[in-house]
From Swiss-Prot:
Native source species: Homo sapiens
Main location: cytoplasm
N-acetylserine sites (modified residues): S2
Protein known as: Small nuclear ribonucleoprotein F
Subcellular location: Cytoplasm, Cytosol; Nucleus
Sm domain boundaries: 6-78
Keywords, ordered alphabetically: Acetylation, Cytoplasm, mRNA processing, mRNA splicing, Nucleus, Ribonucleoprotein, RNA-binding, Spliceosome
One cellular component (GO) term of this entry: U2-type catalytic step 2 spliceosome
One GO-annotated biological process of the protein: 7-methylguanosine cap hypermethylation
SUPFAM superfamilies: Sm-like ribonucleoproteins
Length: 86
C-alpha cells in the first residue's frame, strides 16, 4: 500500500519530467510537465494524446485545466520510448 503524498510537492517534483495525465473523460496525455500553477492547472510540452490506449495524435503544447484531471503519474524512461503500459 502506498503512502499519501502532498500534491503540490509531488507535482513540483515532476516538473521537467515526462508524465501521463488521465482525464475524467478517458483520454490520456503524455508529455513533459512544463509548469503547474496554484490551482494545479498543468502545462505539457511535446504532448501525445491517447484514446483507449491507442495514439490519437501529436498535440505539442497543451494546457489542462485542473478540474478535468483524474490522475497524473510519472512515466519511466522505458515507457517514454516504447509502448504505453497499463
Amino acid at each position: 500500500m502506498s503512502l499519501p503524498l502532498n500534491p503540490k510537492p509531488f507535482l513540483n517534483g515532476l516538473t521537467g519530467k515526462p508524465v501521463m495525465v488521465k482525464l475524467k473523460w478517458g483520454m490520456e496525455y503524455k508529455g513533459y510537465l512544463v509548469s503547474v500553477d496554484g490551482y494545479m492547472n498543468m502545462q505539457l510540452a511535446n504532448t501525445e494524446e491517447y484514446i483507449d490506449g491507442a495514439l490519437s495524435g501529436h498535440l505539442g503544447e497543451v494546457l489542462i485545466r485542473c478540474n478535468n484531471v483524474l490522475y497524473i503519474r510519472g512515466v519511466e524512461e522505458e515507457e517514454e520510448d516504447g509502448e504505453m503500459r497499463e
